[in-house]
Swiss-Prot record:
MF term (GO), any: carbon-oxygen lyase activity
Protein name listed in UniProt: N-acetylmuramic acid 6-phosphate etherase
InterPro entries: Etherase_MurQ (IPR005488), Glucokinase_regulatory_CS (IPR005486), MURQ/GCKR (IPR040190), SIS_dom (IPR001347), SIS_dom_sf (IPR046348)
Similarity section: Belongs to the GCKR-like family. MurNAc-6-P etherase subfamily.
Subunit: Homodimer.
Keywords: Carbohydrate metabolism, Lyase
Note: A lyase-type mechanism (elimination/hydration) is suggested for the cleavage of the lactyl ether bond of MurNAc 6-phosphate, with the formation of an alpha,beta-unsaturated aldehyde intermediate with (E)-stereochemistry, followed by the syn addition of water to give product.
Catalytic center residues: E84 (proton donor), E115
Annotated catalysed reactions: N-acetyl-D-muramate 6-phosphate + H2O = N-acetyl-D-glucosamine 6-phosphate + (R)-lactate
Gene label: murQ
CDD domains xrefs: SIS_Etherase (cd05007)
Amino acid sequence: MSMLKNINTEKRNPRSFNLDSMSVQESVNLMIDEEYGVIEALKEQSLNIAKIVEVTSQALKKGGRIVYVGAGTSGRLGILDAVECPPTFSVDYNTIIGLIAGGEKAFIQAQEGAEDNPDFGKEDLLKINLTAKDVVIGIAASGRTPYVIGALEYANSIEATTIAISCTKQAKISSYADYNIEAVPGPEVLTGSTRLKAGTTQKLILNIISTLSMVSVGKVYQNLMVDVKPTNEKLVERSKNIICEATGVDYVTAQDFYMKANKSVKVAIVMILNDCDYEQALAILKKNNNFIKS
């Protein structure tokens, strides 16, 4: 019997046995209903997720990086999360990194066999000069991807912190990691298509890890992204609105301080809250480890 048969992500969903003969409305309703399994899976793993947020937060505070490693959908989700962090939080592109089996070209076109070689996982970590300060997060819905296992093995060998995220219980990759999340949303509507519920589950976990890790290092004030990088017109307007929300000033005043603060939302807020100039605001932030304290 194939080893895959016993993995949660490969099991058939009895509710969708007749998917090919359902009406469009029936199948739409089914796919929506099946997503409830995602939230239940996350709730069941909430303690593990919280622990991992603590781990990644500490790593960032000590100058370490978060490195996502995955193949196929899992790898693409890691990249999606990583590339959104620089514009949202003004972190360096090397702070949170997404690696995918087969390299960047695999993001848009599958690279056959790339995920089956554990050495490729190690090689990709060598290319980014992984250190013991970093955290490697291996992502594999099936919990058995050789590329991810190779990466985790190498990370362990240099004493980097390792985390495994899978969508099956007793996942193989869990045994290669210091911490693990085994969030099981149930069999897919389309058997084995882990871009569906498993992919959604993984994406939500990564959302939580990256967002709350950024909160822990002062990138958020209240629930405002005060380190947003205003790289387009929408984000420039959002920046001014954030200043208004955080300080209670009107739009014109926010716009004025935005310019005085060299287009830094965080600095503008500190200037307003502390009634100080640009240089004084920078000093206050440095003293407070880049946190805004009202």
